[in-house]
Amino acid sequence: MLSSAYFLPKDKTTEKEIGTMAKAQDRKEIVSRIGDAAKLYRDRLVGKRFMYVFDGRYIEVIYKAENFRHLTGVETFLSAKRFYSYAARKILTAAQIGFNAKHPYDLCVRKVEHIGEVATMAGSESFLLEEIKTDTQSYKFGTTDLNFTLCMNKELDDQGNEKGDCFVVQSLRDEDCFSRSKEAYSVTHIFSRANDKKKYTDLLFLDKNADMNNLPQEVKKLLDDCLLPQGREND
């Protein structure tokens, strides 16, 4: 007599196949998150200039479209500009990205989440790190909210000379990087302006122990009159 179990349909899906399906679903989910992060990056960061005031000094910072791919931490055969364009337009596909030992999935998930938090960090308490050294790269400055760090350098021309007067965000580290930096400072002010404006028009952050009166003169010269205390424009 045959056992009734003999007639039961067998599930032919192997553990390997289940794992493959899960990985495919993971890729679809991260593609969606990358698209959301790209939209925030485009709407709130690209096309703007940010000024961080710290230690009686300041630096100006920009975000470039071609750096978005590296910030996400994913593996892809797409060029940096095409990857960003596809992500921002929500046409990036799961087949166009991948993960490996150098670009692990879990780290990518955290990095993409951090990109979505960058705009918030630009308007909240943060620290400015100077002379950051990682295992593979050195950066002049970085900014951190204690959860992650944005590392930045000035771009170089073909002769190795610095280009422009702004630092460009080039890397996102899933750590605060205090131990990797030479010095750390509290940021007292953060300003922003559109690239087509000559002066800074928006105050994004003001430390509770700082005010607009004690800014360095060179910073005041970069601010629109609407941000300056009355009667102190020419102090």
Where are these regions (language model features)?
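An acidic, glycine-rich, mixed-charge low-complexity segment common to nucleic-acid enzymes
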Residues: M1-Q137, G142, S192-D235
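Compact beta-sheet-dominated globular domain cores
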Residues: D145, T149-D158, E162-A210
